[in-house]
A protein has these predicted regions:
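Glycine-rich phosphate/pyrophosphate-binding loop shared by adenosine-nucleotide-utilizing enzymes
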Residues: 9, 69-74, 91
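A short beta-loop-alpha structural element at the N-terminal edge
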Residues: 10-24
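Conserved GNAT-fold acetyl-CoA-binding loop/helix
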Residues: 27-49
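A short helix-loop-beta-strand connector motif used in the catalytic cores of GNAT acetyltransferases and
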Residues: 51-63, 92
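Conserved beta-strand in the GNAT
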Residues: 63, 70-79, 97
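A short, internal acetyl-CoA/4′-phosphopantetheine-binding micro-motif in the GNAT/acyltransferase core
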Residues: 65, 81, 93-103
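Conserved donor-binding loop and adjoining core beta-sheet/short helix segment
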Residues: 75-94
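Conserved acetyl-CoA pyrophosphate-binding loop and the N-cap/start of the following alpha-helix
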Residues: 102, 106-114
Length: 118
């Protein structure tokens, strides 16, 4: 088992310097490799989208990292208002990604469990 699995895991909101790593995660699968543009420098559209996410109180872009500050994965949460239960929020979990170095070690499950508790 990878040593990183047992280290402290930190879930935090993404910051602008994370954008290249997030795009790299998004591009690292069959579909993402066809739709994402992971070329340095990144297109401004990624930075514009990030700013829109940050400014929207119903959006959270989350990073999972270990105590060595290695990015293990990411996800986006969208909070959607609804009327049932006298009004409230439900969340949509999307763009869950795990770095290929950490796949097959249970991190995707940890990300989803964290998001559900959130």
């Amino acid at each position: 088992m990878d040593e990183s699995f047992n280290k402290e895991l930190i879930f935090r909101k993404a910051i602008e310097v994370d954008i290249p790593n997030i795009v790299k995660l998004l591009a690292d699968d069959e579909l993402g490799s066809k739709r994402e543009n992971y070329k340095v420098p990144l297109p401004n559209s990624y930075y514009d989208a990030f700013q829109n996410i940050v400014l929207d109180k119903n959006q959270e872009l989350i990073i999972l990292e270990n105590s060595n500050k290695e990015i293990i994965g990411s996800l986006q949460l969208t909070f959607i208002p609804y009327l049932t239960y006298r009004g409230g929020l439900r969340s949509q979990i999307e763009a869950v990604r795990v770095h290929k170095k950490f796949r097959g070690k249970g991190f995707g499950k940890k990300i989803l469990k964290w998001a559900i508790k959130r």
